Amino acid sequence: MDKLKGAQRKHLRSQAHHLKPLVMIGAKGVTDQLIGSVDLALKDHELIKVKFGEFKEDKTEISGQIAQATNSEVVGIIGNIAILYRHHPEPEKRKIKIP
């Protein structure tokens, strides 16, 4: 996946505004189950929010780890919520069009 440009990130952040977090990071932190949940959510939705219940001080680092493990990209971090994006591997099934 190509690196997102600033305007593309802004567009995706606006698309994510109305979304609710689909995955929450709890006391166990980043586990294989968490990575699997994020991966499945990205496959189904392409653009998701991940809420930090714990590890709030490490949210930037943890978001990067999750993005690397799921081959996605961190669109932004707002408060205790990270926005992740990964386009669908099949172009005809992509739900989100980015400029």
Please give the residue ranges for each predicted region.
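Positively charged, polar, low-complexity stretches
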Residues: M1-P99
